């Protein structure tokens, strides 16, 4: 089956179809050759190429292909790589590489992104929070409220009781005497077991009420 031509409408259809991260990556990978040819033959398609490469970049992050994302930034046509959104992608990649959580949330939430990529920006923020939650749960025996909030992009200055409630609702324990949270370890479920994903989705629904 022939691949439909790359266009803004086709790109939107791929992004909004709600595929898994792997499906999204595979679908966008198939268009990289078309994008490369467009950049060489039709400079007027700059907006399309910017949207495509931004979406393709996020498909790498959503599948945790950080090294491959770095390689992608080196393949992007020079005239596109110089655009603001591509520079922002590079900033985000550097922050992810260096595990600078506060900077990651700031870039995702405060810097401008191409319109069609907004769903992927939000999707990656949720993915990064889920991933960070698992890492915290399995790396810390105890953690202070402010640190836990910062890792998940919550406002450490928010009402302490609200933050505590969000974590205890996820199975964490609160030691009021020592002012410490005790994370609940997350056991990685088998691929066909949706229990871990369901728990993470519940967690993200809880913390999303905190806002940015």
Curated annotation (Swiss-Prot):
Pfam families, per the entry: CSN8_PSD8_EIF3K (PF10075)
InterPro entries to which the protein is assigned, alphabetical: COP9_CSN8, CSN8_PSD8_EIF3K, PCI_dom
Matches recorded under PROSITE patterns: PCI
Keywords from the named record: Cytoplasm, Nucleus, Signalosome
Coiled coil, from the record: none
Transmembrane segments: none
Subcellular location: Cytoplasm; Nucleus
Domain of life: Eukaryota
GO biological process: COP9 signalosome assembly; protein deneddylation
Family: Belongs to the CSN8 family.
Role, per record: Component of the COP9 signalosome (CSN) complex that acts as an regulator of the ubiquitin (Ubl) conjugation pathway by mediating the deneddylation of the cullin subunit of SCF-type E3 ubiquitin-protein ligase complexes. The CSN complex seems to link protein degradation to sexual development.
Binding partners and assembly: Component of the COP9 signalosome (CSN) complex.
Stated name of the protein: COP9 signalosome complex subunit 8
Source organism (scientific name): Emericella nidulans (strain FGSC A4 / ATCC 38163 / CBS 112.46 / NRRL 194 / M139)
Taxonomic lineage from the root: Eukaryota, Fungi, Dikarya, Ascomycota, Pezizomycotina
Gene, per the UniProt record: csnH
